[in-house]
Design a protein with these regions (language model features):
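Alpha-helical promoter-recognition and RNA polymerase-docking modules of transcription initiation factors
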Residues: 36-37
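Extended, low-polarity segments enriched in aliphatic/aromatic residues
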Residues: 40-339
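N-terminal export signals
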Residues: 7-28
Length: 339
């Protein structure tokens, strides 16, 4: 399937324009969560386990590095930075200067990616390398992990998969930083840390077809016959769990909530213009907590109509349910502001 058909079928070109005034960050933080999670106030007596999610409303290199330094205790050795590097000239991808500043602070680190399932500029390794140059990802090594093959990683406790096919080079790394541009997604409803590794570490031919539940050699032309939304979320969770199980304690997560289009960065220049204001940066060692906190902050924002519609129309909240069922993290979290 060609990229333009993939995006068209996924409904990437439509958006609902939200109206209303901006909400102050203090009010926003006070209102979250609103979708059934538990945000613990600082100073509360904690009962049972909870995760720490660090937050800043300042989206710049200094604060990105600050948050990383709060969660990086377990990072060692050869470090993979899992980043969505985007289609050519994508207007919403993370700023290169921010990523470059952070990468320079992480010894022995490499940006990692995989090729795409759809036939676009990142479908082949050759095209992918050219796209990386166009988008400015030239300041450090970038490893297209499936360029030379695949590897099967086991899924512990999965009900859909026993293994998921990943880019072969993932096993060359000791640790992983999942650096995510949080935004909408055509199929998943939203793209957070879980989506970043669930689809982003799966290889472009076998693994991504597995996660989407389709035949790699015969991608359905009709969007309506692709797997049920809930099944996709569960497949994504199991794929992400395979990566998490592989790295163990040596994987951490950062979500950057800026330029949050309803469309993924795979949409490139045709992505809908964001209507929700930028919110900030989150960091955690817990994948469920950081994605739950990100969703909570989006729901608490007044100008959220198009992004919330995208999440709910794709049953995106089932991503969180699927992670809970697989015991991938904690949806009870303490949101700790560093500002």
């Amino acid at each position: 399937m060609k990229r333009r058909d993939f995006l068209k079928l996924a409904g990437l070109t439509s958006a609902v324009v939200a109206t209303g005034g901006l909400m102050s960050m203090d009010k926003l933080l006070a209102q979250a969560p609103v979708v059934g999670s538990t945000k613990l106030e600082t100073g509360m007596q904690f009962v049972g386990s909870h995760a720490k999610v660090y937050f800043t409303k300042k989206i710049d290199a200094k604060h990105l590095i600050m948050l990383y330094n709060l969660i990086n205790e377990s990072i060692y050795g050869k470090v993979a930075i899992k980043l969505h590097t985007g289609e050519k000239h994508g207007p919403n991808i993370l700023p290169r200067d921010m990523v470059q500043a952070l990468q320079a602070q992480i010894p022995n680190s490499t940006i990692v990616e995989t090729n795409t399932l759809y036939q676009g500029d990142r479908y082949t390794t050759e095209g992918h390398l050219e796209t990386l140059k166009v988008n400015g990802w030239t300041f450090c090594p970038v490893d297209i992990m499936d360029a030379d093959g695949t590897v099967e990683l086991p899924v512990r406790g999965g009900k859909h998969f026993k293994t998921v096919s990943m880019g072969k080079n993932i096993v060359n790394y000791d640790s992983m930083l999942v650096l995510t541009h949080f935004k909408g997604h055509a199929m998943g409803g939203f793209g957070g840390s879980m989506k970043n590794i669930a689809i982003g570490c799966a290889d472009g031919r076998i693994g991504k077809a597995q996660v989407h539940g389709v035949d790699k050699d015969n991608l359905p032309a009709d969007w309506n016959v692709w797997p049920a939304k809930e099944a996709l979320m569960e497949n994504m969770a199991e794929s992400a769990k395979a990566t998490i199980d592989y790295f163990g304690k040596h994987i951490v997560y950062i979500n950057v909530l800026r330029r949050m289009s309803v469309d993924c960065d795979c949409a490139g220049v045709i992505a809908a213009e964001p209507t929700i204001p930028d919110i900030g940066i989150l960091a955690s060692t817990d994948i469920l907590a950081i994605d739950q906190a990100s969703v909570d902050l989006v729901y608490a924002e007044m100008n959220n109509m198009d992004l919330v519609e995208r999440i709910e129309s794709r049953h995106g909240l089932h991503q969180l349910t699927a992670m809970r069922e697989l015991k991938m993290g904690n949806d009870k979290y303490e949101l700790i502001s560093v500002d």
